Amino acid sequence: MQSSSLDPVASERLSHAEKSFTSDLSINEFALLHGAGFEPIELVMGVSVYHVGFQFSGMRQQQELGVLTEATYRARWNAMARMQAEADALKADGIVGVRLNWRHHGEGGEHLEFMAVGTAVRYTAKPGAFRRPNGQAFSSHLSGQDMVTLLRSGFAPVAFVMGNCVFHIAVQGFMQTLRQIGRNMEMPQWTQGNYQARELAMSRMQSEAERDGATGVVGVHFAISNYAWGVHTVEFYTAGTAVRRTGSGETITPSFVLPMDS
């Protein structure tokens, strides 16, 4: 991902990062990352408010809505790129605990705000060792605990990767609706539409990982939203952390832990 230009307001805030850090890490995450050689630098974020355009689709058409797919992807990408720019300005090695949230903005449902937030960290033992080949900081949505486990296993995070697809699922005919009354029946247009949309979103996420030179994607999750488009138009969104192998790693033996609280 190419960084965007750094916002002047953010530049002023980041100029004080060396004095004291700000982080959304929990106490456990902070302690574990510190033990692994990482120290927090500053909370970094990126925002994009986007106007989502209109695309016509007939009621009986089963298809991806490319205009809406591009709009929601580009808005997320802008937010992520601005967060990346803040981390790179701090000369961070990575961004951990990345969260990418959205909300409706303003009165109309066609305005969406996406916000990316994470904690920029530095690898104190060897600054720059965990950056990407292009020199940018890595980004990961993994928790501090998962991050340390990943490193111990001989892998390192590369980038937060994502894919999406806005899909219109055709309205079934009147006779088909009549045949379903009182019966258990599969709804083929919904089944096929969901399959197509998920596959497109997954393939786009995998393409991002391959572009960044990763060997796999971990912590994958799905989200389904229809924003303000109605029940027959849905967006399938998938995201995860692309990883690369760094060594053989160590064998992590599970241990029994007995909680003392009741």
From Swiss-Prot:
InterPro entries: UPF0145_dom_sf, UPF0145_YbjQ-like
GO cellular component annotations of the record: encapsulin nanocompartment; plasma membrane
Location relative to the cell: Encapsulin nanocompartment
Species whose genome carries this gene: Mycobacterium tuberculosis (strain ATCC 25618 / H37Rv)
Protein name: Encapsulin nanocompartment protein Rv1762c
Short name of any one Pfam family annotated for the protein: YbjQ_1
Protein family according to the UniProt entry: Belongs to the UPF0145 family.
Function: Cargo protein of a type 1 encapsulin nanocompartment possibly involved in protection against oxidative stress.
Classification of source organism: Bacteria, Bacillati, Actinomycetota, Actinomycetes, Mycobacteriales
Keywords: Encapsulin nanocompartment
